[in-house]
Amino acid sequence: MQLVAYGAQDTFLTGNPKVTFFQAVYKRHTNFAMENIEQTVNGTPANSGRLSVTVARNGDLIADMYVELSAKSSLVATTNGDSQCWVAERAIKDVELSIGGQRIDKTYQKWFRLYSELYLSEAKKANWGKMTTGKGTVYLPLIFFFNRNPGLALPLIALQYHEVRLDFDLTDEFATYFNTSTFKVWGNYIYLDTEERRRFSQKGHEYLIEQVQHTGSDTVTSNGTKQIRLSYNHPVKELVWCFNNGGSTGSNMWNFSSNVGATDVILNCDVTDLGANCYVPITAGTGAPLLTAGPDGGSLRWVEDGVAPTDGAVGPLSTFKLVLNGQDRFKEQAGKYFNQVQPYNHHTGTPYPGIYSYSFALEPESHQPTGTCNFSRIDNAQVSVTMKRADTSETMHMFATNYNVLRIQSGMGGLAFSN
C-alpha cells in the first residue's frame, strides 16, 4: 500500500532519484601512514618558565599534538578534588606557534577551558576531563588549526627553509601542581605515498586557517554599564568571553560565576553523588571533573539566570550588546541569551554558567566559512557590559576567532594578512 500510495507531492521527494539507501558507496583515498613521535623540548620546566619546541622533520606533515605532564601525587583525589580536576590546564599560561620566526597563532590558558566547553560534545568533554585530570600522567591536547583538522595538517615537506616552532610560557604555579622533571610534547606525523609526497613538496599551498585573538583583560566595575573597546582584526567568526576575579586556587580558576572566590562553587571528580544537586549536565564518565554548587546537598544553586547573591552562584552578566561604529549591532540581551541560546544555535557543547558567546557565523566550529564580521574594516568596535552584582568588580576575558590565510611557497610559509 505504501508503494502505490504515490501522488504529486511525492515527486518532490522521490522523482528522478539520485541516491539509494540500500547500496553502500565509498571513495578511495590516497595511501598514507601515521606515527606519534616525541619532540625535543628545550628548557627546564619551572614556575613562570619558558620552553620551546622546534618541530622535528620526522614526517611529511604534522597533525594533532599533545603535552604530557606528571601531576604531583599529593593532589587531592577525593570528592571536591579541586587540585587534580582539569589539572593539565593549569600548566601553560600560553603557547605560541611560529613559522620562520613569524607568529601564526597563540593559545591562552583560559581558551583551553572555553574551547572544551563550547566546541566539544558531552562525550568528548568527558574524555577531555579524564585526559586532563588526575595524579600522575595527564595530557593536554594542543588546539591550533592544524591540530584539529587533518585537512590542515602542516606540510613540513613544503617548508624546507622555515622551521615550525612552539614556545610555551608556563604558569607561576607550575611546580605546585606538576613534577618539574616531566614536560613532553608529542606530535602525530603523516607519511604520504610517493606521488602525493612529490605534489606536496613541489607546489605552493594556501590554507584557510583559524586564529584566536586576545588583546588583554578588562576590569568591569560594579557601578553601571561599562563600554569596552575591542581591538580586533580580520574576518571574525565569533566572540567568546567569561568573567573571573577569584584567583587560581582550587576551583576559583574555573569559577566564572557571580560568587567570586566562593568555596561553595566546587570542582568534583566523583560523579556518584551529584544527582540531587546538579544544575549542569553530568555524564557517567567516572573521573571527568564537574563544576557544581552547594557541597553536601546544600541549598546554593548554580544557574545562569537569577539575581546575585540572593539566588546563589549565578552567571555574572546582566546585559550585553555589541556596538559597531556607533550603531547597535543587535538589541541588548540578557546574559542567559549568550550562555544558552547562542550555544544552542551555533555550538556542539553546553557551557556551564558564566561562559558566553556571540557568533557571526552559522557554524563557527566548521572550517567552511558560514559568516564573519570583518573587524579590519570597523573603525570603532565596542561592547556594552552590565553586571548583576553591585558590590564586586569582575575581570572580563574576551576572545575572538578569525580567519586568515597561510601561504606556503618555495619552501617558506607566512600569513597573507597581518595585523
Language model features with spans:
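Short, low-complexity Pro/Thr/Gly
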Residues: 1-419
